[in-house]
Amino acid sequence: MMNTLEKLELLSENCSDRTELDRIIGQLLSIILTRHRQKLAIYDQDIKKFEQTYKLDSNQFIQQFEAGILGDEMDFFEWFSLCELRQDILVKIGKLEKAL
């Protein structure tokens, strides 16, 4: 089985020109971007549920959570993790959008 780098080299060798290779890579990046946007929508829905349940927006929540003001409820750890995942995916989306 070929590793990823070998597959990329094979793809590069078999494309007729750089324009074709750029188009193929662009299509792959677009697929990844779509998946990331779908994940973001799920994270946003889940975060919104926490905000409604605790009547607190996520920015206020993060400040209070990091300051130790809130308790150790499992919900708070899940909410915080979702906020971190959301931030990470936003960075990835931004990079992909710049590349496309």
Where are these regions (language model features)?
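Short, compact, well-ordered microdomains
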Residues: 72-100
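Small, basic N-terminal interaction modules of short regulatory proteins
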Residues: 1-52, 59, 91-100
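Amphipathic alpha-helical coiled-coil segments and their boundaries
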Residues: 22-25, 29, 36, 65-68, ...
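Amphipathic, hydrophobic secondary-structure cores in small proteins
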Residues: 50, 54, 60-62, 75-79
